[in-house]
Amino acid sequence: RHHDIALIKARAKHVPWSVGLHHVSMQIEGGTEEIKRLHSRLIGKGVEIDRVVDHSVGWGLYFYDPDGNRLEFFYERPNLSLEEGQKIFREAEAPSRSIDISELG
């Protein structure tokens, strides 16, 4: 894994000392097919999808729970070494490129 807890520099609009949580991420097995299956299932249940993301180290499916908390299902790219993943994550400051669900392989 490239990280267990990621501390990322906040954007300028962040209010210092405010209480909050950006999101909680849950790592999954099953690859991009599992992300597509979860996406379809969440939509079928009426869950609000935020976005699908290519993080360069893996793919994420962001959505909101009934209380408005932002959650993520995350699949890490296979065969990515810890060092490679940390380098990508560090150099790009947690890369996040929004993609369409159809772009998943």
Residue ranges and their predicted role:
Residues 1-19, 64, 70-78:
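Conserved short beta-strand elements that form part of the metal-binding/catalytic scaffold
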Residues 13-105:
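Vicinal oxygen chelate
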Residues 2-3, 22-23, 55:
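Histidine-centered active-site/metal-ligand motif
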Residues 8, 27, 52:
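A cross-family glycoside hydrolase active-site/sugar-binding cleft signature
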